[in-house]
């Protein structure tokens, strides 16, 4: 092992059993965690269909200790499974899936940058949290919130420019964003706070989990 540099499993036949077993285990844990999060009701956020789902931690583990391909596969499998208990919240499932994919890619990117640092995983998850908060807050303003409101019939168009204009004029919408009367300020305040808290929780679980997996599975991940 060279410092904190992670060596991925080589694509050899005798590693296939480990790949399948570990991926299946991570998928099962991700599904269970995602399901549990649906029963955790937090005032205000639950009314907006926002859940603090931290199942992505296990998808990230698969990306590092098996492969990116396997991780993307179980991410899609987890998303499809979520439709069983989220049949009326298609946009919510797609949003969580998008957040999971961005988390996987950001952790891979920042691991390449910080792999030689002493507290590697802390830096990886810290910058992933900040990047996700910025990306998803922006997407919520431009795409996700307009689609969500259009899907449930709150607005007549998913065009974010028109939605922002209607929000600013109609005080009935202000409930969604802490009573703030400006669409973009409301988007920033709500979703930056939500995403920082959510991915902060992901980091709190992700750092010790990744360090534990790194410790106990390292020998199996070394390419000899």
Swiss-Prot record:
Keywords: Cell membrane, Membrane, Transmembrane, Transmembrane helix. This is Uncharacterized protein MG350.1. The keyword Repressor does not apply. It comes from the Bacteria. It comes from Mycoplasma genitalium (strain ATCC 33530 / DSM 19775 / NCTC 10195 / G37). The chain crosses the membrane at residues 25-45, 54-74, 91-111, 119-139, 142-162, 174-194. It is found in: Cell membrane. The lineage of its organism: Bacteria, Bacillati, Mycoplasmatota, Mycoplasmoidales, Mycoplasmoidaceae. Its main location: membrane. It is a multi-pass membrane protein. GO terms for cellular component: plasma membrane. The keyword Membrane applies.
């Amino acid at each position: 092992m060279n410092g904190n540099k992670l060596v991925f499993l080589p694509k050899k036949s005798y590693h296939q059993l480990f790949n399948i077993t570990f991926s299946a285990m991570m998928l099962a844990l991700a599904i269970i965690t995602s399901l549990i999060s649906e029963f955790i009701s937090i005032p205000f956020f639950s009314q907006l269909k926002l859940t603090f789902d931290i199942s992505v931690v296990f998808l990230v583990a698969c990306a590092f200790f098996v492969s990116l391909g396997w991780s993307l596969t179980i991410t899609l499998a987890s998303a499809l499974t979520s439709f069983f208990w989220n049949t009326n919240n298609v946009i919510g499932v797609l949003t969580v899936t998008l957040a999971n994919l961005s988390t996987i890619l950001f952790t891979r990117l920042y691991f390449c940058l910080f792999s030689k640092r002493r507290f590697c995983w802390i830096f990886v998850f810290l910058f992933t949290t900040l990047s996700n908060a910025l990306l998803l807050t922006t997407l919520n303003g431009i795409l996700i919130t307009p689609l969500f409101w259009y899907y449930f019939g709150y607005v007549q168009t998913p065009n974010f420019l028109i939605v922002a204009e209607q929000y600013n004029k109609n005080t009935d919408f202000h409930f969604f964003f802490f009573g703030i009367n400006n669409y973009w300020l409301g988007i920033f305040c709500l979703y930056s706070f939500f995403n920082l808290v959510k991915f902060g929780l992901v980091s709190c679980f992700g750092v010790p989990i990744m360090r534990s997996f790194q410790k106990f599975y390292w020998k199996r991940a070394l390419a000899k």
